[in-house]
Amino acid sequence: MKKLQLLAPAKVNYRLDVLGKRPDGYHELRMIMQRVDLCDEIEIALSDSPGIRVTCGRKGVPDGPGNIAWRAADALLKLSDKEVGIEITIAKKIPVGAGLGGGSSDAATVLMGVNELLELGLTDERLMEIGVKLGADVPFFVFKKPALAEGIGDRLTALEEVPSLWVVLVNPGIHVSTAWVYQNLRLTTPDPATIIPRSYSSLNEVCELLSNDLEPVTCGRFPLVSELKEVLLTAGARGSLMSGSGSTVFGLFESESAARHAAAEIAKARGWFAAAVRTI
């Protein structure tokens, strides 16, 4: 039977504004999102045996319907008239519960892969409509471009220009519940009319953008996250920010050599996950 081997990239948020709480319980967001080349490796294969099977082998990542990738495959299998099974194998490279969108990226990659394998012919726009029902970040990974994300993250506008940057990701191994962060968020009164540029020509302009309304909540419970920012800045980052709801913090560097050196030194000195990656 046919199979595909695909990469599911992580993301960072250069900016995350929480504008308010919606009647449906979700929060109104405004984010600048960027993919990076730290990727989970996903194999999707059709099978003669009915059903969906997900194998991951990473502690804390479920193999059955509790896995968002399983639910993505199920959503598309229901649209097909083919009597086949789907086998998904995920090699996790992206830290789990880390604010890097690994689960959402896996789901988006499965949507795109199963769409191809089952020859459904669904457009990216249709896959994004299906994806947002699985998770708010899923449409971004189908979109495949640096984007301004609004609403719950499902209204996407491509950035006109954004520089290719070297980024160091640092994760201390702390699992942060996104739901917990939003439940403990104290809303301020940001101005929804604030203009967020759609074009960034330099590292300096991206650094000026860095802001995350969720950071005080996560740092309040896990002060180590604040320490990570200082560690990155001391290591030469031009700017540093927590990604998503944490606990990963990223630093923006001027060159590949500076990023790789910083990642190696941080991993050696602290024992944390540290990786030099490129924006894509």
Curated annotation (Swiss-Prot):
ATP binds at residues 95-105. Transmembrane segments: none annotated. GO terms for biological process: isopentenyl diphosphate biosynthetic process, methylerythritol 4-phosphate pathway; terpenoid biosynthetic process. Its EC number is 2.7.1.148. It catalyses: 4-CDP-2-C-methyl-D-erythritol + ATP = 4-CDP-2-C-methyl-D-erythritol 2-phosphate + ADP + H(+). Pathway: Isoprenoid biosynthesis; isopentenyl diphosphate biosynthesis via DXP pathway; isopentenyl diphosphate from 1-deoxy-D-xylulose 5-phosphate: step 3/6. GO terms for molecular function: 4-(cytidine 5'-diphospho)-2-C-methyl-D-erythritol kinase activity; ATP binding. It comes from the Bacteria. SUPFAM superfamilies: GHMP Kinase, C-terminal domain, Ribosomal protein S5 domain 2-like. InterPro entries: GHMP_kinase_C_dom, GHMP_kinase_C_sf, GHMP_kinase_N_dom, IspE, Ribosomal_Su5_D2-typ_SF, Ribsml_uS5_D2-typ_fold_subgr. PANTHER family: 4-DIPHOSPHOCYTIDYL-2-C-METHYL-D-ERYTHRITOL KINASE, CHLOROPLASTIC (PTHR43527:SF2). Belongs to the GHMP kinase family. IspE subfamily. Catalyzes the phosphorylation of the position 2 hydroxy group of 4-diphosphocytidyl-2C-methyl-D-erythritol. This is 4-diphosphocytidyl-2-C-methyl-D-erythritol kinase. It comes from Citrifermentans bemidjiense (strain ATCC BAA-1014 / DSM 16622 / JCM 12645 / Bem).
